[in-house]
């Protein structure tokens, strides 16, 4: 069975509590439950991983390379805008990457408009709340089909 790794970056464990105007009131636990349901509907295995520690995220990405995951969906949170370490780790992957964000990063503060991950990703989905993850999983599923 194909496997997709969903990565949640810094501060995303605070979904449901942090800035509901941008992120809504759905918790990360609820988001991960939906992700599992959507993955089952799409016919692949999924693992969700969240950390607030950049080195742990890089290590999980390195492990994904060794595991030959079939696709990665990532919401790196604020790391999106400045973490060359996360970007360098992602560059190692052979699997397609889909970047997602709950809020529209291009309609927010200027510093959020730039993504150091975007150039590595097959595409970016943002601004659709929790549905950004659903759309990201659909994109990952389609990319897996195309690449196999």
Curated annotation (Swiss-Prot):
GO molecular function, one term: 3-dehydroquinate dehydratase activity
SUPFAM superfamilies with a match to the protein in the record: Type II 3-dehydroquinate dehydratase (SSF52304)
InterPro entries tied to this protein: DHquinase_II, DHquinase_II_sf
Protein origin, superkingdom: Bacteria
Pfam families: DHquinase_II (PF01220)
Site entry (Transition state stabilizer), positions: 18
Pathway the protein acts in: Metabolic intermediate biosynthesis; chorismate biosynthesis; chorismate from D-erythrose 4-phosphate and phosphoenolpyruvate: step 3/7
Gene3D superfamilies xref list: Dehydroquinase, class II (3.40.50.9100)
E.C. numbers: 4.2.1.10
Active-site annotation: 23, 101
Gene Ontology biological-process annotations: amino acid biosynthetic process; aromatic amino acid family biosynthetic process; chorismate biosynthetic process; quinate catabolic process
Top-level class of the enzyme under EC nomenclature: lyase
Classification via CDD domains: DHQase_II
Recorded family membership: Belongs to the type-II 3-dehydroquinase family.
NCBIfam families in the cross-refs: aroQ (TIGR01088), PRK05395.1-2 (NF003805), PRK05395.1-3 (NF003806), PRK05395.1-4 (NF003807)
Record-linked HAMAP family: AroQ (MF_00169)
PANTHER family linked: CATABOLIC 3-DEHYDROQUINASE
Subunit structure and binding partners: Homododecamer.
Protein name listed in UniProt: 3-dehydroquinate dehydratase
Organism field: Syntrophotalea carbinolica (strain DSM 2380 / NBRC 103641 / GraBd1) (Pelobacter carbinolicus)
Gene: aroQ
């Amino acid at each position: 069975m194909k496997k997709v790794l969903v990565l949640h970056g810094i501060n995303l464990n605070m979904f449901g509590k942090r800035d509901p105007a941008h992120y809504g009131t759905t918790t990360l636990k609820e988001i991960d439950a939906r992700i599992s349901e959507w993955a089952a509907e799409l016919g692949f295995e999924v693992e969700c991983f969240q950390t607030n520690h950049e080195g742990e995220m890089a290590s999980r990405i390195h492990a994904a390379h060794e595991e030959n995951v079939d696709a990665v969906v990532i919401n790196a949170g604020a790391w999106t805008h400045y973490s060359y370490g996360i970007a360098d780790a992602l560059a190692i992957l052979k699997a397609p990457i889909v970047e997602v964000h709950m809020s529209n990063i291009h309609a927010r503060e200027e510093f959020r408009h730039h993504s150091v991950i975007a150039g590595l990703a097959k595409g970016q989905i943002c601004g659709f709340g929790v549905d950004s993850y659903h759309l990201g999983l659909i994109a990952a599923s389609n990319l897996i089909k195309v690449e196999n």
